[in-house]
Amino acid sequence: MTILKKKKKGSPQITPDERYRELDSHAQNESEIQEDVPISRKIANFLKLAYNEIRENISIYLLIIVYLCVCVMNKLLAKRTLKKIGNYSFVTSETHNCICMVVFFALYFMFGRRVMSAKERHRNFGVQFLLISLLDACSVIIAFIGLTRTTGNIQSFVMQLSIPINMFFCFLILRYRYHLFNYVGAFIIVVTIAVVEFMLSFETQEENSIVFNLVLIASLIPLSFSNMTREIVFKKYKINILRLNAVVSFFQIFTSCLMLPMYTLPFLKQINLPFSEIGTNIKNGFRCLFLGQNTIVENCGLGMSKMCDDCEGAWKTFIAYSFFNICDNLITSFIIEKFSTMTYTIVSCIQGPAIAIAYYFKFLAGDAVMQPRMLDFVTLFGYLFGSIIYRIGNIILEKKRMMEAGNDDDSEGELTNADSIITH
């Protein structure tokens, strides 16, 4: 029996991975930064890291830009649609759900069925689809009530609270773990928007109620659970995005009916609808949307009990809104599938300042064009700075996971060598 310092035949030779060499170089750079080095060297190292981050994730950043453009157009066209046919919300909601269902099912049968996973092919996801639809419906209904006495500035701030709410539930249910920079980045985004919206609140005299503000905040909870359910279905069962959106749209045709009794609530002001008038409202809504016929033209307008109809060409605005909303749903599902609920939450929060800036351009906003405000750019800067800090936290966590994986591989290699050095 002899002792040889060599491995068994067939055992793969373990060589350092290029990724870990790069990580070692990063670690050396970090140790250099901690020493007395010129400011220019620190800036150069930071710019190099930023360049590598953008180069390695260029597709992600392009997707974010596309998603941002789609979101801005979706929100602008939603407001234009509301201005034209705001008296018939139920009709527009149900018609939009039907359009989404037809489009998603058509796309699924043309492209989606060819790439079905084995788990998706042998499992029925009706319960998960229904759960997502019910959670979305609950979120819409609760938000519908909260929005009635929540001013526009407070609405914008409440939407940003989805960041800490999603972080909490993802930590609790999906077992996410965060770096300190994740918390700091999220905190910067929320505080920046809170300060700006607090300053803007002094410029408005609209009615606002703290109780309804809390109701609006509560609507973010079912929305968070809906997104987490999507993430679980996507990542655990590899379900097709088109199939999920198609079936969810089908269920939403029925869950939207849950909103009908909400229109009878007396505090809904201009959109209040007595129960006895629901049938007439639905009929007039179809006439407005498809025939362009105005019904409510007298005793209506700003400060009155009803909005005035502006049905001419309403179907064009509505179709454009439906198109961008469908694109929004597809990109949202793709981000949640490929990345995570928190990635989508952080990305979606840029909508607020981006939409505010979009209202500066008449060709986008139409009659709702606004004058530029410095506070909107401050909000955008705060969001971008907070997002960069949040992303740095993710990079650090990814680096730690890679280092741990490298250590595990090295320890396995040492055990293999120890077993193989004793040979005959």
Curated annotation (Swiss-Prot):
A Pfam family hit: CRT-like
Region spans: Disordered: 1-32
Glycosites: N87
Keyword annotations from UniProtKB, A to Z: Amino-acid transport, Disulfide bond, Glycoprotein, Membrane, Transmembrane, Transmembrane helix, Transport, Vacuole
One annotated Gene Ontology cellular component of this protein: vacuolar membrane
Any GO BP annotation: amino acid transport
Localization: Vacuole membrane
Cytoplasmic compartment segments: 1-57, 111-124, 175-179, 230-246, 338-345, 398-424
Impact when changing Y390C: Increases amodiaquine transport with no significant effect on chloroquine transport
GO MF, one example: xenobiotic transmembrane transporter activity
Signal peptide positions on this chain: none
Protein name: Chloroquine resistance transporter
Gene from which the chain derives: CRT
